[in-house]
Amino acid sequence: FDFRNQLIKSELGDTLAYCYQCATCSGACPVAQVTEGRYNPRRLILDSLLGLKEKIFGPENAFNIWGCTMCDTCDEVCPQKVELTEIFIILKNMSVQRGEAPEHYTMQASTVLETGKAIPMQSAIERRRGQLGLPDVMAPDVEEVQKLLKATKLPEKLPKKEE
């Protein structure tokens, strides 16, 4: 139960122990509905309560954590006011520390770090904006974005690029 206690003692995970497994969160979760239960916040909370790291972490279990879109629906409907989204953030951060973040997340983060944007502007979009009379999209201040991301230690959390 060391893992469970670590979660409960964390700044954001102290409401974990309030969960009585009513499954209201899973019933309201849009991801659980779309994935026909493959993503299941109640199960993730249960595995956390039981300290079952092997069911939470590892490449084969990545969707268990990373399927959450942080919409906060589960937090809104929980009768015990368990801060599920905050607990899922803790689990995602642990996953990153273990080097288990899904590749598409780390690739997206690398793109933001390098360019200041999550999605680069495409010429077709620029043309269409011009046709609609919309102003040009301002380029981000890449140095400012990098400064902010370095303050959060993002570069240290990304996989090292092979040269």
Sequence positions of predicted segments:
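Aromatic-residue detector
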Residues: 3, 20, 31-32, 45-47, ...
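Ferredoxin-type iron-sulfur electron-transfer modules in oxidoreductases and energy-metabolism complexes
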Residues: 1-11, 35-65, 81-119
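Iron-sulfur (Fe-S) cluster-binding modules
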Residues: 1-15, 97-163
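Well-ordered, non-transmembrane segments within structured domains
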Residues: 28-33, 44, 156-163
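Cysteine-centered iron-sulfur cluster-binding motifs in ferredoxin-type domains/subunits
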Residues: 15-32, 62-82
